[in-house]
Amino acid sequence: MAKNFKLPVQIIDFIRTHHGTTVAYFFFKKYTDLNPWDTTKENEFTYPGPKPFSKETAVVMMADAVEAASRSLLKYSEESISELVERIVYLQEQDGQFSDIPLTFKDISDIKSSFKKRLSNIYHVRIAYPERDY
């Protein structure tokens, strides 16, 4: 569809790689809960890829996953946001999604710090201001 609309190749790259070869875990978990005897279908719930192949496509993958997961937080605090970002990026790293990219530990640390700051700004809790009498 992106090619039909003549989107730039860089945008198409982001579209193709933003899920990499990850498992659509929510749907896979639902399936295995309903079919506990069938553990052979994980590949049917796995995105075809490719994995991110540039720092930029890796950042988009991380941002997409972190933003989506942040919507399911029950409580927004610095701690819950930090734990979420750490967990999501750790799982992507462990899954080998960044194996084709020269990301350094510093790169990943800087990216996670940026996400934590941005999400904290988005979800910050304001104090309730008292009503003014006019």
Named regions from a protein language model:
Residues 1-134:
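Terminal helices and disordered tails flanking the catalytic cores of nucleotide-processing hydrolases
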